[in-house]
Amino acid sequence: LALSLSDTVYQSYTGTDNFEDRQIKNIRALASVYPNAVQLVTLAESDIKSIVDLKGKRVSVGAPGSGTELNVRALLEANGISYGDFEPQRLNFNETADAIRDGDIDAGFWSVGPPTSSILNLAATRDIRLISLSSEEVANAQNEVAVFAPYELAAGMYDGMEEAVQTIGIPNVLVVNADMDEELAYKLTRLLFENTDE
């Protein structure tokens, strides 16, 4: 059993992107467990209103090789934006929040299940704004990565967030070996669905 982002599972199963020349055909997704949401955060007084406004700015794209960085790169490239268009900073979640708070960067990305503790903490100390994606930007991302899906961050999720924010979500899936016994797969799936409230 493993828990993985579905884009990574898709790449490994199809032998594409990071899994070129090392395809893994004997895996199956047993269930979608919860979604990560790409969250782009800046300070409320920032002039950044869309992903296009990131050009020329200092932007955290997540820790090197992280799911955040992979998701962000795919999202931006699908919308004609490359790392050469801004100053990418490879910071983890807490470092990103601290750097936004201290004015060391202009914006930062998170790809994680919301609400996110580091964003909650940042919103408690500074006025922040989450940046919405346009419907076209979401569609462009979906065309690039089959497992990307529209996702809405609910109004009020973070202090000062008065409106819902449109973004993309990436399911985290429970991955198993293709040879897993069918009865065991059934029992695991039943256990998950019978305990969703827990």
Spans of features found by a protein language model:
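Acidic/His-rich structured neighborhood in mature extracellular/periplasmic domains
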Residues: I51, P64, T68-E69, R73-N79, ...
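Pocket-lining segment of extracytoplasmic ligand-binding domains
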Residues: S6, T16-D17, S46, S82-V175, ...
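Short helix-capping segments at alpha-helix termini
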Residues: R22, N79-G84
